[in-house]
Design a protein with these regions (language model features):
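Anionic-ligand binding patches
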Residues: 2-9, 41-192
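A short beta-strand-loop structural module common to alpha/beta enzyme folds
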Residues: 29-37
Length: 192
């Protein structure tokens, strides 16, 4: 089991990531990264690179801590980040309807005591039921899709449109718990 021996800094303002770390029983503080989030590549390359940038930006401001940064995106026929409008959310949801897609999260941890850097990615496959235009309009009207990659939250009302997942549920929420635990243990072993 991971024993927290130094401060943990979450380089994200995501309420979902905060909730996941709290559920894991970890003490942490938040320092939101201001890293450039423009990058092109495969979905896995994108989430790994963006999580690294976020962690590096925050690591410069903290010594004696572990920095944890993450980046999540949804990939169907195209990369889906957070929608910029209700219309874009509708388009994303229509594209996900009655189909499989992948959710990728890249996690980077930097131990500023040793300079150790770990970056890992997780993929979860998600299947949506067939959604009607009315389903999509009603869901978008709740506002829930507007701050989430792929325009849905599996842990909220968006969960009613998902009939199957293959992989980590917490990855779809925004932070894969088992992966985070393993990375923390790996950093802890490196300190012994």
């Amino acid at each position: 089991m991971f024993t927290q021996k130094c401060p943990l800094i979450l380089a994200s303002g995501s309420p979902r990531r905060k909730e996941i770390l709290t559920t894991m029983g970890l003490s942490f503080s938040v320092d939101v990264s201001d890293a450039d989030e423009s990058f092109a590549g495969t979905p896995e390359e994108m989430v790994l690179e963006l999580s690294r940038r976020k962690a590096q930006a925050v690591a410069q401001r903290h010594s004696g801590a572990i920095i944890l940064a993450a980046d999540t995106l949804v990939f169907g026929d195209e990369v889906l980040g957070k929608p910029h409008s209700a219309g874009e959310a509708r388009r994303m949801l229509a594209g996900l309807s009655n189909r499989w897609h992948s959710v990728y999260t890249g996690v980077t941890m930097i131990d500023t005591r040793s300079g150790s850097v770990l970056s890992r990615a997780d993929e979860t496959r998600v299947h949506f039921i067939a959604m009607t235009e009315e389903d999509i309009d009603a869901y978008v009207a709740t506002g829930e899709p507007l701050d989430k990659a792929g325009a849905y939250g599996i842990q909220g009302r968006g969960g009613m449109f998902i009939d199957r997942i293959e992989g980590s549920y917490s990855n779809v929420v925004g932070l894969p718990m088992a992966l985070v635990r393993g990375m923390l243990l790996e950093l802890e072993k490196a300190q012994i």
